[in-house]
A protein has these predicted regions:
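Bacterial Sec-dependent N-terminal signal peptides
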Residues: 1-22
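Subset of outer-membrane beta-barrel
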Residues: 19-279
């Protein structure tokens, strides 16, 4: 019992220290799930079967799509407990050029609704609508019958700066790319069912920082991350399948350094602390 209590204490202490070093990035809307399947599976998608929304999690899956082409459109209300006009919309199209390759394109738009600005209660409000968007293009190629890779390019535009009449309110923009891979085994016969293995990886949002206000000192990392996953399909017949999938995600941006607060000390004992005694 003492060992268990000690382990819990260590984990709690580590968690408390980690919360003091919160990692923040620009354009976090890139990590919001746009489709119902991924959202319902805790943002998993790098090693699931191919669908029209594979662009966000692993475009290499398009090379294994059973459909020659596909189109998807989604609308996701976001943070509805805070506001009723924050939402994410996405449109995606993919096309299998041949048996080995496919390309896809998508547009993702994140709107933060209308915000009223006024200097005082009596002023006539001025309405602004901050928003962010990303345009993606990807190409997938089968390197073998069971493995494919893909590369995706992404243009990102963030228009969050609220003009105040004294500073530049131009939108910030940057670019990023993804490198992804997907493995899918041949369907194998077991005693009571057929089965198939899946695995995937994706290095996402690799690119330079995003710069706001045209100021080189006011920059933010974009949410670069690594996704790894694997799974197995229990295939009972043409219409019934159960999939077991597991994935891990690692954010690839620096963790803020620990800050040490030095308490001032009255070294000479005179009851006051001057600047020379503050480190």
């Amino acid at each position: 019992m003492k060992k268990i209590a000690l382990i819990i204490l260590i984990i709690t202490t580590f968690k408390t220290q980690a919360q003091d070093r919160v990692i923040t990035t620009g354009v976090p809307f890139l990590l919001i799930a746009a489709d119902a399947r991924s959202a319902g599976m805790a943002d998993m998608g790098v090693a699931t079967s191919a669908d029209a929304y594979s662009q966000q999690y692993n475009p290499a899956k398009y090379a294994f799509s059973l459909n020659g082409q596909g189109f998807s459109m989604s609308y996701t209300p976001y943070l509805t407990d805070i506001a009723n006009d924050i939402s994410l919309g996405q449109v995606t199209y993919f096309n299998r050029i041949n048996e080995r390759s496919a390309f896809a394109g998508s547009l993702r738009y994140f709107g933060l609704g209308d915000i009223e600005l006024r200097q005082s209660f009596e002023d006539t409000p001025r309405t602004v609508s901050p928003n962010e968007l990303a345009i993606d293009v990807s190409y997938a190629l089968k390197l073998s019958e069971q493995f494919s890779m893909a590369i995706a390019g992404r243009f990102i535009r963030s228009n969050l700066k609220i003009p105040d009449g004294t500073s530049d309110a131009s939108a910030a923009s940057t670019f990023a790319f993804d490198v992804a891979g997907f493995y899918q085994s041949e369907e194998e016969a077991y005693s009571d069912f057929n089965g198939r293995w899946r695995a995937g990886f994706n290095l996402q949002n690799l690119g330079p920082k995003i710069k706001y206000d045209n100021d080189v000192t006011n920059t933010n990392f974009i949410p670069s991350n690594l996704r790894l996953g694997g799974g197995f399909d229990f295939i009972f017949d043409e219409y019934n399948k159960v999939s077991v999938t597991g994935e891990v995600t690692k954010l690839l941006v620096p963790t803020p350094p620990e800050r040490t607060i030095v308490e001032p000390v009255d070294s000479n004992g005179d009851g006051t602390i001057d600047n020379s005694e503050v480190n």
